Curated annotation (Swiss-Prot):
Highest classification ranks of the organism: Bacteria, Bacillati, Bacillota, Bacilli, Lactobacillales
Organism for this UniProt entry: Streptococcus suis (strain 05ZYH33)
Catalytic activity field: S-sulfanyl-L-cysteinyl-[protein] + uridine(34) in tRNA + AH2 + ATP = 2-thiouridine(34) in tRNA + L-cysteinyl-[protein] + A + AMP + diphosphate + H(+)
Residue numbers marked as site, Interaction with tRNA: H129, Q345
Gene this protein is translated from: mnmA
Annotated protein name in UniProt: tRNA-specific 2-thiouridylase MnmA
Interaction with target base in tRNA, as annotated region: 99-101
Stored Gene3D superfamilies: Adenine nucleotide alpha hydrolases-like domains (2.30.30.280), HUPs (3.40.50.620), Translation factors (2.40.30.10)
Length: 374
């Protein structure tokens, strides 16, 4: 007996890309009552009057017409500015390196958009993320990595709550990216050959330094080695991230070993950028971190200890860790020293294939001593 999905309404977040296009197509083919929604989160009109969002919405319209679903555009620019972009700027002001994608999923795609979809009578929202959800008999939802390891996006979805996941579908989670392209091409979708978007949505193809400089005044200062040698001037602490190699302008001229130079720390109060030679410079290595905004996708006790694996950045192999949780804070102790743990980035916890949740990195430590001098 086939399941009748026609009474289940799914509102799909459509970006004008191939992933969300195939998401809508698959749900339509499975018989769901599908509505496509294009989210306009940022005014990206350039000096020539060209707006990427306008072009993307045309692609959404073309695909929606092809597969026969209604579609609308909704403007979340204010919500995005207040909840994501202000956070992004505040983190850079504090000398950290934020991850706006994590916050965008938490606050916009699975909060503002989810609320909007529910007002349209949705039973679920769906997106083109590469992640999977499974449901226990009691209704508890588990979020699993996407089947395509190279595309898995659970790192960016790690702040989603059980309530958000209850209302979410990820139709691409079991597919490999080439299969998604193939489905789009077979169906003749207008977006089948469209390039994937990369980078932060509100920066796009713009020069990052120039973009950030429009909102935060750059404050040049001294570049120093950890042992106090003056290495010249930096252009502003916000432009550098822990472990960064390029853009320092100092080559391998001092130290004799000709190894490349890396950013190893920042002192916000003195406006000093610390640099050191060698990929595994001792100041880049740490044995634990402190995280805040720690959150799990399922109900957990207020205080507990967890043995699991973790990622400290996207596209990184898992590392074995011990997590000591107290409220929304955690100490994460590494089984092996880790390189370039970066304040502002997400730390995400896994149990095998399941993403358990995560938090935001506040500080890295080496044998109890703070590493980055922020």
């Amino acid at each position: 007996m086939s399941i009748d999905n026609s009474k289940t309404r799914v509102v799909v977040g459509m970006s004008g890309g191939v992933d969300s296009s195939v998401t809508a197509l698959l749900l339509k083919e499975q018989g769901y009552d599908v509505i496509g929604i294009f989210m306009k989160n940022w005014d990206d009109t350039d000096e020539n009057g060209f707006c990427t969002a306008t072009e993307d919405y045309k692609d959404v319209a073309a695909v929606a017409d092809q597969i026969g679903i209604p579609y609308y555009s909704v403007n979340f620019e204010k919500e995005y500015w207040d909840r994501v972009f202000e956070y992004f700027l505040a983190e850079y002001r504090a000398g950290r390196t934020p991850n706006p994608d994590v916050m965008c999923n938490k606050e916009i795609k699975f909060k503002a958009f989810l609320d909007y979809a529910m007002n349209l009578g949705a039973d679920y929202v769906a997106t083109g993320h590469y992640a999977q959800v499974t449901r226990d008999e009691d209704g508890t939802v588990h979020m699993l990595r996407g089947a395509d390891n190279g595309k898995d996006q659970t790192y960016f979805l790690s702040q989603l709550s059980q309530e958000q996941l209850q209302k979410t579908m990820f139709p691409l989670g079991h597919l490999q990216k080439p299969q998604v392209r193939e489905i789009a091409e077979r169906a003749g979708l207008a977006t089948a050959k469209k390039k994937d978007s990369t980078g932060i949505c509100f920066i796009g193809e713009k020069n990052f330094k120039e973009f950030l400089g429009q909102y935060l005044p750059a404050q040049p200062g001294r570049m120093m080695t950890v042992d106090g040698r003056d290495m010249g001037e930096h252009t502003g602490l916000m432009y550098y991230t822990i472990g960064q190699r390029g853009g320092l302008g100092i080559g391998g001229q001092i130290g004799g070993d000709n190894e490349p130079w890396f950013v190893v720390g920042k002192d916000l109060s003195k406006n000093i950028l610390y640099v050191g030679q060698g990929f595994y410079h001792e100041s880049l290595m740490s044995t634990s971190l402190q995280a805040s905004q720690v959150h799990f996708t399922r109900d957990m006790p207020e205080e507990f200890t967890l043995e699991c694996t973790a990622k400290f950045r996207y596209r990184q192999p898992d590392s074995q860790v011990t997590v000591k949780v107290k409220g929304d804070k955690a100490e994460v102790i590494f089984a092996e020293p880790q390189r370039a743990i970066t304040p502002g980035q997400a730390v995400v916890f896994y149990d095998g294939q399941e993403c358990l949740g995560g938090g935001m990195i506040d500080m890295a430590y080496k044998d109890g001593e703070a590493c980055q001098y922020i």
